[in-house]
Amino acid sequence: MDNELFEKAPIPEAYFSLAMPVVLSMLVTLVYNMVDTYFIAHTGNTDMMAGVPLTAPVFTVMIALGDIFGLGGSSVISRLFGQHRFADGKRLSAFCFYAAIATGLLILVLGLAFRDPMLALLGATDDTWQYASDFYTLIIVGSPFIIVSMTPSNLLRTEGHAVQSMIGSVAGTAVNIVLNPLFIHGFGWGAAGSAGATVIANICTDAYFVWFTLRHSSNLSIDPRTVIDRARRRLAVTAREVGSILAIGIPSAITNLTQSVGIVMINLFLLPYGTDAVAAMGIALKVIMIAVLVFVGFAFGAQPLIGYNYGARNMPRLRGILRFSYLFLSLFALVMTVVLSLSDRLLMGFFIEDATIITLGAGMLRVQLLSLVCVAVVMVTTCTFQSAGKAVGAFVLSISRQGVMLAITLFVGSRLAGYQGVIAAQAIADLLTAIVAVILFVVMLPELRSRKAR
């Protein structure tokens, strides 16, 4: 473990060493998602194009479940490492790994048992049923591998292995990009081929993470004996430790889930204004998502650094890290706002050629960009609460931006300003959530000022 990086390296160096690999990994994954859609679209089969996206919420749930043990575990383990309790960190890392496997197996059993009701709930019709079913079935079969992949990718960063975490994620994405056209077009497996490529890619990612942990990790473990008290024949993990992991992991999972919920809510409120408005907002939100993913990468890439120094009670360094995080991401968001605003029509044109939708979407994009700085503030604050184990603050922010706050602003905005109110709802929700984040952070400040070194 690179204690020098966490304890003594200049803050910008430590910050970017941990965060940049996460940013790059997220951007590569974003590229894959676009490429995956491209390969499905080029089958020319509209029923397949409609059927496969119906299963997207299932994949989102799997990622969220993986985050419970990945982000929740990394928060607790980072703080333990800061206290130099390396044996406890190793024990909990093994618990998180096998808890993710158990969760994946549970999803596999339940997902197959309730396949038909789930497909109906997801909106599969007679035309799309077969394609949705093919994709859903293979994704469910691969759920243990998909869920598990999220755990070591986060835990490795607690030791400073951010680059190796990125390599595992990027390698899986590369395998997916290679296998997708081969399985879909070369072998003619269609939707099943796309799902199969995704599962195999996650298996490759898991294999790399297991190999790296066994060969190069000094304070993480996947040895089941690490987490079993053989003398008492029970798990060597306390209810309090599990509760600490879940207290941070569940809000992280909720954050992922509310992203999908938020998009659905916006679409429902836009439907009365026509499909062009829905399509335009969909593209505008894709552009915004690119910026948000970069923010997430920078903010949460630094999570092990924040957690380690909080656990070590190194308050001067922690305050310096937080100042740098807020300043850097806020300035970065400001630059992104200007650049994307000046390129609004060009960016819309990358996704569609319809002039009406480009005009609508460009206006929507400019409105959404007004709150990018607020999004940056929310991301850094959320990461701070998660890193410090502040479950209440993390939970409040996880349900706010694209959950409770968005629901309120959509409802009020649509009634007060109609179409324009719906368009501005997310930006206003971002502003309100940022205000809540600042208030919660101010409440936390006395502890940051008074917390003494051990």
Predicted regions and their residues:
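N-terminal transmembrane alpha-helices
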Residues: 7-38, 42-43, 57-72, 76, ...
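Small-residue-rich hydrophobic transmembrane alpha-helices
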Residues: 49-109, 146-165, 280-338, 342-344, ...
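Hydrophobic/aromatic residues in alpha-helical transmembrane segments
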Residues: 20, 36, 73-74, 114-115, ...
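Helix-terminus/linker motif at the lipid-water interface of multi-pass membrane proteins
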Residues: 27, 31-50, 119-126, 182-189, ...
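Short runs within selected transmembrane alpha-helices of multi-pass transporters and secretion channels
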Residues: 139-157, 165-176, 194-209, 296-299, ...
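Short alpha-helical transmembrane segments in multi-pass integral membrane proteins
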Residues: 1-19, 77-144, 186-249, 306-371, ...
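Hydrophobic transmembrane alpha-helices of multi-pass small-molecule transporters
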Residues: 61-64, 176-180, 206-210, 290-293, ...
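Transmembrane helical elements of multi-pass membrane transporters/channels
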Residues: 17-36, 138, 172, 201-205, ...
